[in-house]
From Swiss-Prot:
One of the primary rRNA binding proteins, this protein initially binds near the 5'-end of the 23S rRNA. It is important during the early stages of 50S assembly. It makes multiple contacts with different domains of the 23S rRNA in the assembled 50S subunit and ribosome. Part of the 50S ribosomal subunit. The gene is rplD. Belongs to the universal ribosomal protein uL4 family. It holds the Pfam family Ribosomal_L4. This is Large ribosomal subunit protein uL4. GO terms for molecular function: rRNA binding; structural constituent of ribosome. GO terms for cellular component: ribonucleoprotein complex; ribosome. Keywords: Ribonucleoprotein, Ribosomal protein, RNA-binding, rRNA-binding. One of its GO terms (biological process) is translation. Residues 45-66 are annotated as: Disordered.
Length: 201
């Protein structure tokens, strides 16, 4: 199959298995959820009644005071007491094998092509790391919400886009399922497309 390049009259020959496969929603959902879960810190921690300092002595005798019986001032029903089902640090990551991950990326790329959200250009860059220059270039292409994917890290592009809302710059190694679906359009250089094909082959 062919992908028409926006800044050239030629078209780029690409693999049908990478850019023309059927959309597998269940697989994409599973991989995106796993990716997001892996980004969680999982460092939340609370103290149970046995971990809160103090509370070893019975506050008052069992009977004869007229008050409700109490065995510890660190009971979960007391102020400053422990937490009944205290949250503990945990690993939220989910296992996703390489085949599934690659399949999800292929599925997303194919869907981007179908929805005409993938824009391929011969080259994309700016002469200086100026946000104004990048905004002008994107305005020219009528792009506001876009992920720019280049073959290698472009320092000028990265610095210019750093302060822009809804604009991100990644190299091929930095793409992931979440970033590919998070933006309205995905702008890729021809070299980046070739590298992605090799990576997913």
């Amino acid at each position: 199959m062919e992908l028409v390049m926006k800044d050239a009259k030629s078209a780029l020959e690409v693999s049908e298995t990478t850019f023309g496969r059927e959309f597998n929603e269940a697989l994409v959902h599973q991989v995106v959820v796993a990716y997001a879960a892996g980004a969680r810190q999982g460092t939340r921690a609370q103290l149970t009644r046995s971990e809160v300092s103090g509370g070893g002595k019975k506050p008052w005798r069992q009977k004869g005071t007229g008050r409700a019986r109490a065995g510890s001032i660190r009971s979960p029903i007391w102020r400053s007491g422990g937490v009944t089902f205290a949250a503990k640090p945990q690993d939220h990551s989910q296992k996703v094998n390489k085949k599934m991950y690659r399949g999800a990326i292929r599925s997303i790329l194919s869907e981007l092509v179908r929805q005409e959200r993938l824009i391929v250009v011969e080259k994309f860059g700016i002469e200086a790391p100026k946000t104004k220059e990048l905004i002008a270039k994107l305005k020219e292409m009528e792009l506001t919400d876009v992920l720019i994917v280049t073959a290698e890290v472009d320092e000028n592009l990265f610095l210019a886009a750093r302060n822009l809302y809804k604009v991100d710059v990644r190299d091929v190694a930095g793409i992931d399922p979440v970033s590919l679906i998070a933006f309205d359009k995905v702008l890729m250089t021809a070299e980046a497309v070739k590298q992605i094909e090799e990576m997913l082959a």
